[in-house]
Design a protein with these regions (language model features):
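Phosphate-binding/switch region of NTP-binding enzymes
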Residues: 48, 67-140
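Conserved inter-motif catalytic segment of the P-loop NTP-binding fold
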Residues: 2-68, 72, 79, 139
């Protein structure tokens, strides 16, 4: 059985024709845009798309990550989400060092937060802990 199916079974998620998984995706600007458009055309009742992780859809190359490149990635996903009135949730990692503001722990530049409508940061006190807290911030 696939890893996705095993996880569904482990968490007690019933199989449904309204839940779809894709285990491969193009890069933003290089296939992903078309994949997303095709998906919502085939599934017009889509309300949520989760991308896990954002790093997998970034262009790989010599360009260093900058505020502009981070802002562009989120901006393109936001434009797609707004066009289709859906939520696109991207999973991204945090830095391991502590920060005064928990959102400063997000890996990358502030461009990731600057363009998104909102951000959620889930943290555990210990990696093996069963409980976590979620901090939420909105652009407005």
């Amino acid at each position: 059985a696939s890893d996705v199916y095993k996880r569904q079974m482990m968490y007690g998620v019933n199989d449904t024709d309204r839940l779809h998984f894709a285990t491969a995706a193009g890069k933003i600007g290089n296939g992903l845009d078309e994949q997303l458009e095709n998906f919502v055309r085939e599934h017009p009742d889509t309300k949520l798309i989760i991308i896990d992780t954002m790093q997998k859809i970034r262009e790989v190359g010599g360009e260093a990550y900058s505020y502009a490149s981070d802002y562009e990635i989120i901006g393109r996903l936001k434009q797609f989400a707004d066009k289709h009135c859906i939520c696109v949730l991207t999973v991204h990692h945090t830095r391991k060092q502590p920060a005064g503001d928990s959102f400063e722990m997000i890996s990358g530049t502030t461009g990731l937060l600057g363009c998104a409508d909102g951000s959620l940061l889930m943290q555990k006190k210990k990696r093996t802990a069963l409980e976590a807290t979620i901090d939420v911030v909105g652009r407005d």
